[in-house]
Amino acid sequence: MGVCSWISVPGADRDSSAVASAIAEHLSPTGLLLQEIYRNPAAQYRHYDHNLTRIELSGSYKQEEHAVIDQIGQGFRYAAFHADSYIRRGNHTIWGSAGYRTGRTMHTVWNESADFELLYPYVWGDSVGGSLSSEHYTFEGGYARRFGRWTWGIQADYRAEIEYRTVDPRPRNVVSDLNLSTGASLAVGKQYTVGLHIEAQIYRQSSSMRFLAPLGGPKEYQMLGLGMYSVRFSTGGDQSSVYYKGGSYGIGVELFPDNGRGWFALLHYSRWRVKRILPDAPYQKLPLTTLNDSRADVEFGWIRHGVLHRWGFKTHGTLANRRGTEHIYGDASGSSNYPLLGSVQQYLNNRNRAEVVCLWGMERPNGWSLYTECNGQYAAFEARYLDPARRMQFSKAGGGADVIVGIRRGHGMLRFTLCSSYLATLTSDLLTTGLDPESAIGQALRDTYARLRSGLLLYGVSLHWSHIWQCNTAFYVDGTWKHGSFDDGNRVDYARIACGIAF
């Protein structure tokens, strides 16, 4: 979670002071403690006290010396455009955003599908891989209205993505991802509001493969998890394809203070389901696997503002489990239909996480501000394949701290942040029954396990500068750099630079 100073600009004209206050409010560290509450569209009605529109250009870079997860790659190079707006008028609030991103994901292997984290382990891939180019579009819009003690809101966001490679193997992935949510809230007493929201997702991805080399290309494996793959349906044919059809639903309950000061809590549950389908002849839209993922989140915390000081804390816990089912088919009949003989649940994955965040800040009348944030966290991951028995497990614990110094002088604002954290390995285990450790798949699985279980030291700096013009507009620049060192010697670097205008 990023944090920054809360800055006002006394002495400036009314318009420039308003945009300065809006920028500071959108970057407020105490406000970010409440971020999960605003999944309820009704809560967006009082998300901010000031209206703000931002238009931004950015570039980002990430490079891992060795890919921690081969299927995600060694990093990326992206250029992006993003615009967002939040406007409140009387009892009405509207918000929205639009974005475009283009670039490359570097050196992926054993995965030719998009959205690996959504679909794993049910992707298809090969031992060659390579860098992937992509174009990514996002659109979001929402509306909330207050009726006395009641508030109602609705939100929709849509993501479209095209991912491809121009050398063999040549995947082409097209993603369509629509999310809808609606919610209501009721003011109880003079300070608090209780909210309820529901959400739904519709997800589609078509993934096709081509080889232009005269001798064809590598075998495309239909992955089943922990080095397992479907022998029967893994092919190396040109113009083969995979189709993903899925969606999710969720429900959340929230308690939060009207003025952003006091106790807050939430409980959220969601369930995700997606089928991997083989659409080409002779399979005739055959469902190969079904993936189910359930997740429950619970959070509570407290925020207080004094004359000079701010305090806050929150605790967050997540329990998630993923279950994968393989469908078993008989031989195709004369009509090319494969009879379904049965289904078996073979893949199980549990992910648990707990985090505690504590925040203290001080705002001085002379324009200086200082914030410190400390956090502790625990994470556990376990994946199992039932027959043959395979298992990957690791758990980690650690903590970190951020120090943020802010200053404002006239129409200028500056924020400097130092951050550091360390995650240490507590337990780890790998069981690979029946897997040849010298095979390409066996070596890839062992390398991934070694990197995932490794402890990580992460540190970095960020800088924000903005200048308020008299015409109710601000120009700003954001820069971030982070470096990570793993206990096994692997390294990762991340950098992002952005500039934009706000009004």
PLM features: residue spans?
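Transmembrane beta-strands of outer-membrane beta-barrel pores
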Residues: 57-65, 100-104, 145-149, 158-162, ...
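Outer-envelope beta-barrel architecture signal
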Residues: 49-55, 90-96, 148-154, 190-196, ...
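Outer-membrane beta-barrel translocator domains and adjoining extracellular loop/strand segments
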Residues: 65-72, 107-113, 164-171, 207-213, ...
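N-terminal, post-signal peptide beta-strand-biased segments of exported outer-membrane/organellar beta-barrel
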Residues: 6-106
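Residues that define the transmembrane beta-barrel architecture of outer-membrane proteins
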Residues: 65, 75-81, 133-139, 172-180, ...
